[in-house]
């Protein structure tokens, strides 16, 4: 592995700041942390809608927790595998990936994502991870045309689904929709991949790989996606070593910390835990899981906050310390050859917790109503802006739209960029501004975006 190749940036930088001793990955982390796109995560839905309660996680606090878990995983792997110290060369790199992993997700969570994907159905689709790649490499105004201009290895690590939309998309049968209110998310799952509009950047990221590695890394397969219950498209098969750590940290945070939110708010109960979780984990072949299960269950649903926090810490520690490094010797490049994976019994346990959150939290009618509302807001905004972009878009977005039109590029992508960058609250107020007769002046809104 030639580290200098992976530390390259698309746009060469000759900045020499006074007494700046930071590594390339420390600079990447700073750019992400100080970006407007990262700040907006504080007002974007994680699982529970923003404003429902002041306890639960937003996309921002979730990302901070993913970062902490990610560095914890790296520390454990460094201790277990000293022979792989070159792979685990930078905590700042992993922090960067974890902090940035949700930066492209639109307002209103999955509802907003499905809405944008539907509105972009004839224009290359929309998906949050693809938008993250686009923000980091093109949209965030740290540079004029190169986004945050991050290191190549950072960009490789953010690629959860390394294949373009056109390679993954499978046309499905859909009921004819005559009104946006009829849209069913199950019929319009976003393609998990990179937008074709960004293929040039994708090619640059993969440039150091051999032809064989590149071909295998971007290969696809049929089959349902593990994160989705209805997924007709092809799916990618591989991710880089750094990405595998980030994804595990994300899964642990989702399964454990979002479960904590649901327990505190009374959405998940002890009886549901004993019905859906305990039977599987009681039969686990792992001694630690069987030994800790009863104590964890009792503490999670205790009225003593410190006991619940102890159980949460025990769960996170259990998963983090059960992560190992696996090898796929078909790849030449070490960043692809090795991945972080969970031991099988802990992978089962993590999936059980994720299914618990999905069943009792995500599918809860009150949560689905909020998601549906967000879905309608996003589609309404998109339809309005698409009807007359040069009249309704903010001036700076109008400039981007006109440039895309003049160059024969995908102008609808500009609309998706603008709407996906909104917070839940801003999108809701803008919708009211456009469609409610009693809404006030647009002056205040224009100052925010």
From Swiss-Prot:
This protein's name: Deoxyguanosinetriphosphate triphosphohydrolase-like protein
Origin species: Shewanella sp. (strain W3-18-1)
UniProt entry tagged with the keyword Translocase: no
Family, similarity comment: Belongs to the dGTPase family. Type 2 subfamily.
Listed PROSITE patterns: HD (PS51831)
Record domain HD: where: 59-255
Region (Disordered): 1-25
Signal peptide: none
Family annotation (Pfam families): HD, HD_assoc
């Amino acid at each position: 592995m030639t580290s200098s190749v992976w530390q390259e940036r698309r746009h060469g930088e000759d900045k020499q700041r006074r007494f700046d001793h930071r590594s390339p990955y420390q600079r990447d982390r700073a750019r992400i942390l100080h970006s407007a796109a990262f700040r907006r995560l504080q007002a974007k839905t994680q699982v529970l809608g923003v404003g429902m309660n002041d306890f639960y996680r937003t996309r921002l606090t979730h990302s901070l927790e993913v970062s902490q878990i990610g560095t914890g995983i790296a520390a454990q792997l460094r201790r277990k595998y000293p022979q792989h110290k070159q792979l685990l060369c930078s905590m700042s790199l992993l922090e960067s990936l974890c902090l940035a992993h949700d930066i492209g997700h639109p307002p209103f969570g999955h509802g907003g994502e499905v809405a944008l994907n539907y509105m972009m159905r004839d224009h290359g689709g929309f998906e949050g991870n693809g938008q993250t790649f686009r923000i980091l490499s093109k949209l965030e105004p740290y540079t004029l045309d190169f986004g945050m201009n991050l290191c190549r290895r950072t960009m490789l690590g953010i690629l959860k689904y390394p294949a373009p939309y056109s390679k993954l998309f499978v046309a499905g049968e859909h009921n004819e929709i005559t009104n946006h209110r009829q849209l069913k998310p199950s019929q319009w799952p976003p393609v998990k991949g990179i937008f074709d509009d960004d293929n040039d950047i994708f090619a640059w990221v993969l440039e150091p790989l051999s032809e064989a590695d590149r071909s295998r890394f971007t290969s696809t397969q049929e089959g349902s996606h593990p994160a989705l219950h209805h997924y007709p498209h092809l799916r990618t098969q591989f991710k880089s070593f750094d990405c595998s750590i980030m994804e595990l940290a994300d899964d642990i945070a989702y399964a454990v910390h979002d479960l904590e939110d649901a327990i505190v708010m009374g959405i998940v109960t002890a009886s549901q835990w004993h019905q859906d979780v305990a039977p599987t984990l009681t039969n686990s072949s792992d001694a630690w899981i069987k030994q800790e299960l009863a104590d964890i269950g009792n503490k999670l649903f205790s009225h003593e906050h410190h006991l619940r926090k102890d159980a949460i810490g025990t769960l996170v520690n259990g998963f983090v310390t059960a992560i190992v490094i696996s090898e796929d010797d078909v790849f030449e490049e070490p960043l692809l050859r090795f991945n972080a994976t969970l031991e099988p019994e802990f992978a089962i346990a993590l999936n059980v917790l994720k299914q618990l959150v999905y069943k009792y939290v995500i599918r809860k009618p009150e949560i689905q109503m909020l998601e549906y509302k967000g879905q309608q807001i996003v589609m309404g905004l998109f339809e309005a802006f698409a009807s007359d972009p040069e009249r309704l878009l903010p001036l700076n977005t109008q400039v981007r739209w006109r440039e895309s039109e003049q160059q024969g590029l995908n102008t609808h992508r500009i609309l998706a960029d603008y709407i996906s960058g909104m917070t839940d609250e801003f999108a809701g107020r803008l919708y009211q501004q456009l469609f409610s007769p009693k809404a006030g002046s647009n002056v205040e809104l224009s100052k925010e975006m």
